[in-house]
């Protein structure tokens, strides 16, 4: 009720402590699609295009098992799953961005290599 009345809800990011605002449209979208029409599983199973999943093995925000589950649902002919060891959700990049690091550089390299192989 409060979300609707205010038109937004504030959620604290547990990692950064940043206060994030979600407009009531997010709630309306969730309600409108509660029948699973916005199913990640269904979308991934129906995707017949190249898909690259890059996941930090120490991700506390989205555990690696969720990335593995997406990979398991995917068409293996088109999908690659890259695990970045000892790395969290942001690949050890902080906000605001100041500089890169070896782990993030590896993510960029793997992404570029994937795009070059699949689209050039």
Predicted region positions:
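Short beta-strand/loop motif that positions the catalytic acidic residue
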Residues: 46-48, 53-55, 59
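Short, glycine/charged-enriched secondary-structure capping and boundary segments
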Residues: 1, 66-70, 96-99
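Catalytic histidine neighborhood in serine/cysteine hydrolases
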Residues: 74-92
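Short alpha-helix in the alpha/beta-hydrolase fold that links the catalytic acid
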Residues: 49, 63-73
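Active-site nucleophile elbow and catalytic-triad environment of alpha/beta-hydrolase enzymes
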Residues: 21-44, 49
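Hydrolase active-site cap/lid region
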Residues: 1-26
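Catalytic active-site module of serine/aspartate enzymes centered on a nucleophile-bearing elbow/loop
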Residues: 87, 91-120
